[in-house]
Amino acid sequence: MVKFPALTHYWPLIRFLVPLGITNIAIDFGEQALNRGIAAVKEDAVEMLASYGLAYSLMKFFTGPMSDFKNVGLVFVNSKRDRAKAVLCMVVAGAIAAVFHTLIAYSDLGYYIINKLHHVDESVGSKTRRAFLYLAAFPFMDAMAWTHAGILLKHKYSFLVGCASISDVIAQVVFVAILLHSHLECREPLLIPILSLYMGALVRCTTLCLGYYRNIHDIIPDRSGPELGGDATIRKMLSFWWPLALILATQRISRPIVNLFVSRDLGGSSAATEAVAILTATYPVGHMPYGWLTEIRAVYPAFDKNNPSNKLANTSNTVTSAHIKKFTFVCMALSLTLCFVMFWTPNVSEKILIDIIGVDFAFAELCVIPLRIFSFFPVPVTVRAHLTGWLMTLKKTFVLAPSSVLRIIVLITSLVVLPYLGVHGATLGVGSLLAGFVGESTMVALAACYVYRKQKKKMENESATEGEDSAMTDMPPTEEVTDIVEMREENE
């Protein structure tokens, strides 16, 4: 067997990240399979794609914050009691999300958000609200899955997490194929992707829960002892989680905001519907080469030696922060290469859209420029993921909150200003998303610099204090000093 000594320190990182990267790519493939389920409906395919895209992006806004509870499981859950607290938080969050789904589907609030704000016609608006109602139970299932995924990642079961996500996608593809041959294609085409989404989530959630009970439940204590930092409180979990949730919520609300401004910019015409459909098709394809980079933020908490549970579990771990930095840079370079190969090589991106999603060539050509803009996303995404992981390790996530605010400000500013420069449609949407990413990453970098300076100053103060203590220790006892002084006085 050929061995590579230079890669010895990187194999644990590769084994950990590859399944997570596959997970992220698998999710994008799942979205494309769902889009194909709609595109296969020849009648009103563009309208159906736009309706589902609006509903799905709004739903992701609610499920986004819950998926970040994966990081709570990764950092905080050391016992059965900790897990019970994390699950309780997610049950409450899932119930709240379901209530919001119902309100938007049936109340005037939903009519205003979807029909009025997005300037879509009555047909698209009613289909979108109906799809949103059908998706009401999804946030709860997604939350349960991500909570257990975080616990599994803490114990280095990233392969199992990856298998669960791949099973999710396989289930989606299979059920899309089955339902396309059912009566739903004629009666309620929207249910084809939605039911497939539910079946995939059910498979993923079941796999992760069974994996937890088989591999982890019996080996973790009922309560966390002092060597593991004690029991985590719900307050600590929520204090750690809310900045990450806010960031992910702004990331997820970015798509609905983009859809809103793009649709309003084109006046709710057929061109607006086409632009939203293009965005719906290009999001998963454009996200595929760089989306897995976000999983880099799980590397620091999983391998950091200052984490009490890692000290116990990884006594032979030789991964250092320098190895993590080099590994992160290589991942970014790989992602950039993939983006430029996929989106700048002639006819490759069109072929992906035609073969995977099932759109026609004319529609695929309209997606080329937005996809090329996605080529520049890996740089800000890598910077954000790497620094976020470091801050998660220090449990200093509160400094990340301003980055989400700046992202929204930059995003909306771009959506308002770029049309005056002649940029419209899907190009306007993706270009503004890139500007938002750059703004967010810049703020995360500034926050990391602030924390680094505080940590450095704290270490210097501790070193100075230890030096003073050492000097005091080297001094002779007070009684001895007194005796010496008295002896000198007697001699004089």
UniProtKB/Swiss-Prot annotation:
> How does it sit in the bilayer?
Multi-pass membrane protein
Report if keyword Transcription is assigned.
Answer: no
Which reaction(s) does the protein catalyse, per the Swiss-Prot or TrEMBL entry? ATP(in) = ATP(out); citrate(in) = citrate(out)
For this UniProt entry, the molecular function terms from Gene Ontology, in alphabetical order, are: ATP transmembrane transporter activity; inorganic diphosphate transmembrane transporter activity; phosphate transmembrane transporter activity
Q: In which tissues is it expressed?
A: Expressed in heart, brain, liver, spleen, lung, muscle, and kidney of adult animals. Strongly expressed in the developing articular cartilage of joints in the shoulder, elbow, wrist, and digits of the embryo.
Keyword Zinc in annotation: no
- Give the region (Disordered) as residue ranges: 458-492
* Top-level lineage group: Eukaryota
Biological processes, Gene Ontology terms: ATP export; bone mineralization; calcium ion homeostasis; cementum mineralization; diphosphate metabolic process; gene expression; inhibition of non-skeletal tissue mineralization; inorganic diphosphate transport
Q: Name one GO cellular component term.
A: plasma membrane
Question: Which regions face the Extracellular side of the membrane?
Answer: 107-131, 180-189, 348-350, 427-429
Gene inactivation effect: Mutant mice develop early-onset osteopenia in long bones associated with diminished bone strength. They show widespread calcification of soft connective tissues due to almost absence of PPi in plasma.
Membrane-crossing residues? 86-106, 132-152, 159-179, 190-210, 327-347, 351-371, 404-426, 430-452
Location relative to the cell: Cell membrane
Question: Topological domains (Cytoplasmic): residue ranges?
Answer: 1-85, 153-158, 211-326, 372-403, 453-492
Keyword annotations from UniProtKB, A to Z: Cell membrane, Membrane, Transmembrane, Transmembrane helix, Transport
Query: What family classification does the UniProt entry report for this protein?
Result: Belongs to the ANKH family.
Known function: Transports adenosine triphosphate (ATP) and possibly other nucleoside triphosphates (NTPs) from cytosol to the extracellular space. Mainly regulates their levels locally in peripheral tissues while playing a minor systemic role. Prevents abnormal ectopic mineralization of the joints by regulating the extracellular levels of the calcification inhibitor inorganic pyrophosphate (PPi), which originates from the conversion of extracellular NTPs to NMPs and PPis by ENPP1. Regulates the release of the TCA cycle intermediates to the extracellular space, in particular citrate, succinate and malate.
Query: Which disease shows up in the entry for this protein?
Result: Defects in Ankh are the cause of a generalized, progressive form of arthritis. In ank mice hydroxyapatite crystals develop in articular surfaces and synovial fluid leading to joint space narrowing, cartilage erosion, and formation of bony outgrowths or osteophytes that cause fusion and joint immobility and destruction.
* Name of the molecule in the record: Mineralization regulator ANKH
Source organism of the structure: Mus musculus (Mouse)
